[in-house]
Amino acid sequence: GEYASRVELIRGCDVIPEPVQWIWPGWLAAGKMHVLGGAPGTGKTSISMALAATVTTGGRWPDGTRSIAGNVVIWSGEDDHADTLAPRLALSGADLTRVYFITDIREGSDRRSFDPARDMEPLRRKLVAIGGVRLLIVDPIVSAVTGDSHKNAEVRRGLQPLVDLSASMRCALLGITHFSKGTG
């Protein structure tokens, strides 16, 4: 049936420990997913734009440490890049030459919306071509989930391609989420 043909195991004594690589030491790890959540209107997008500005300029983090300058890629299903995100980034002092917005997918002369379930490989190729991507922001992170966002298994399945992309590119993945009523 639908059983795995072989499960791979590794003994703990055979694991070679690797240090965590940090974008912002102690806060944003390279190749890992991070979630910034809060009630609507509490500044989540503003915080993420400030983080993006710090990365693009090689600026200082709130704790005074300096960021290594790099590129930032943003996929937003809620805010428009022209009237909201780019202006907020500019106000945050971002180097807009280092910011890239995922807009759509071209298939020949046709365009369609970006679909994480089927477009990770074209996105990975684009990120490799850009080079130096240190931060990938997805707002809201639930937009990467094609199934029921209230079912843990479907959420994990939907997010896994982004998590894998982040790990392979060694960039931090920052997902923005809104608390539902009664959970804040």
Label for each model-derived stretch:
Residues 35-36, 41, 46, 73-75, ...:
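Phosphate-binding/switch region of NTP-binding enzymes
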Residues 30-34, 70-71:
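Pre-Walker A (Motif I) flank of P-loop NTPase domains
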Residues 1-23:
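N-terminal pre-Walker A segment at the start of P-loop NTPase domains
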